Regions:
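Pocket-forming structural segment of enzyme catalytic cores
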Residues: 1-69
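Acyltransferase
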Residues: 72-137
Length: 137
C-alpha cells in the first residue's frame, strides 16, 4: 500500500471504538480534540509515525490496546478523529495549510506564500470547552 500500516476490522459492529478522544500531537501545542467511531484496528509500520498520542484515558486511538492515533508520512496525515477536527483544533488546520502552501511553492519554484494569521478565538474557545468537559488541561 501507500502507507506502512495494516488495518483489520475487529469482530462485529458491536466492537467499535466510539467516544471523545484527546491527543497530544506535534502539529499543535494545544491538545487535539475529536471524536472517534471506528471498527478498524490499525497497526503502524516502522517507516511512519503516529498523528498523535492519546492523553490520559480519553479515547482509544488506532487500537483498543494502544495509545496512539492516526499516521503521518511525508505529506500524508491520517486520523480516526471526527467531529469537527479542524474547527476545534486551529493549530492542526494551520499546520496542514502551511504544509500544503510550502509544497505548492516548492513545486512551482515560487516564494513560499504563508497566510496571515486569522482570529482563532472561537475555535480556541471550542477546544478549551471540550478540554474542560473532558477533564483535560
Amino acid at each position: 500500500g501507500i502507507l506502512d500500516i495494516e488495518t483489520q476490522r475487529a469482530g462485529t459492529s458491536a466492537d467499535r471504538l466510539i467516544g471523545d478522544i484527546v491527543l497530544g500531537s506535534s502539529l499543535a501545542a494545544l491538545p487535539v480534540i475529536g471524536y472517534e467511531n471506528h471498527a478498524g484496528r490499525t497497526c503502524l509500520g516502522g517507516s511512519v509515525e503516529p498523528f498523535g498520542s492519546v492523553e490520559g484515558s480519553v479515547g482509544h486511538g488506532n487500537n483498543d490496546d494502544g495509545n496512539i492515533d492516526g499516521v503521518r508520512y511525508r505529506n500524508v496525515t491520517g486520523t480516526y478523529l471526527h467531529g469537527p477536527l479542524l474547527s476545534k483544533n486551529p493549530e492542526v488546520a494551520d499546520a496542514l495549510l502551511a504544509s500544503a502552501l510550502k509544497r505548492r511553492a516548492t513545486r512551482l519554484g515560487i516564494e513560499d506564500s504563508a497566510l496571515g494569521p486569522l482570529d482563532d478565538g472561537e475555535e480556541r474557545a471550542a477546544n478549551a470547552f471540550m478540554r474542560a468537559r473532558l477533564g483535560v488541561k
